[in-house]
Amino acid sequence: MSKSESPKEPEQLRKLFIGGLSFETTDESLRSHFEQWGTLTDCVVMRDPNTKRSRGFGFVTYATVEKVDAAMNARPHKVDGRVVEPKRAVSREDSQRPGAHLTVKKIFVGGIKEDTEEHHLRDYFEQYGKIEVIEIMTDRGSGKKRGFAFVTFDDHNSVDKIVIQKYHTVNGHNCEVRKALSKQEMASASSSQRGRSGSGNFGGGRGGGFGGNDNFGRGGNFSGRGGFGGSRGGGGYGGSGDGYNGFGNDGSNFGGGGSYNDFGNYNNQSSNFGPMKGGNFGGRSLGPYGGGGQYFAKPRNQGGYGGSSSSSSYGSGRRF
């Protein structure tokens, strides 16, 4: 049986969200364009279940990850005379995380060991794309490494590829990788989700299940004071000064009173690092870091797909 007939790579890694579609685009015209870069195992334009009108986005699934990379490397794409925005599709589970659908070029890397140097990070992450900046964070007073870093790429596609994969090993140790978001981006993400502005790129099942809450995760909205604590935790993550809220506040703590300086063992009082499921950072479940949080970084230009062609409801909980 051929590789295309029996794909061995996870479907989620082979799927692209295509935003900004013309309302005239059909499954056939979408397929005709994207199959230029490889065999498609699925292709669908999402439509309103009642009116059958296009919702302005769709999904294409390739037979192999290699073909997904080829299509992304061929950007920009124009379908039926309109420039569209392809992005790596986000699973339903991951789509609940704050900022999951924002377009960013920077990642947070947590749980790195004290002997990890810039070249270790570069050696591992350069397989995903061109790296612009690597910043290993240190304590301003002692100069001791704080156990986390930021890596900035020249293309959001590199970040999307990285965060889809659950496990990353740097310098022989597992680490936690998330999109790095500014407080402004977090507020924007929360606002757009509550307003149903069509900023998502969900991708579960055939066409994606568009489930979710009005807020990201389960801990309420993340735009307010102490906004990153989750519903079960005490300290907020990057709220009003307690949390890590950017490079201008290097002496700050990661929420509930303890600084993140044990290189993977965040073991201080009540801060809840994961707004998704409440595990403490360094925690007892859900892998080494417990939850599904995002991490604040230096503000940058905001991105994300929220185009006018996709104004109908995301997050309704129905499957199409």
UniProtKB/Swiss-Prot annotation:
**For the region Nuclear targeting sequence, what residue ranges are annotated?**
268-305
Locate residues linked as Glycyl lysine isopeptide (Lys-Gly) (interchain with G-Cter in SUMO). Answer: 113
Q: Where is the composition biased (Gly residues)?
A: 197-216, 277-294
Q: What are the record keywords, sorted?
A: Acetylation, Cytoplasm, Isopeptide bond, Methylation, mRNA processing, mRNA splicing, mRNA transport, Nucleus, Phosphoprotein, Repeat, Ribonucleoprotein, RNA-binding, Spliceosome, Transport, Ubl conjugation
- Which residue positions does N-acetylserine occur at? 2
Q: Where is this region: Globular B domain?
A: 95-185
Region Globular A domain, residue ranges:
4-94
Q: Does RNA-binding appear among the keywords?
A: yes
The entry's comment on post-translational modification says: Sumoylated.
Instruction: Give the protein's biological function.
Output: Involved in the packaging of pre-mRNA into hnRNP particles, transport of poly(A) mRNA from the nucleus to the cytoplasm and modulation of splice site selection. Plays a role in the splicing of pyruvate kinase PKM by binding repressively to sequences flanking PKM exon 9, inhibiting exon 9 inclusion and resulting in exon 10 inclusion and production of the PKM M2 isoform. Binds to the IRES and thereby inhibits the translation of the apoptosis protease activating factor APAF1. May bind to specific miRNA hairpins.
Q: From the Swiss-Prot or TrEMBL record, give the protein name.
A: Heterogeneous nuclear ribonucleoprotein A1
Which gene does this sequence derive from? HNRNPA1
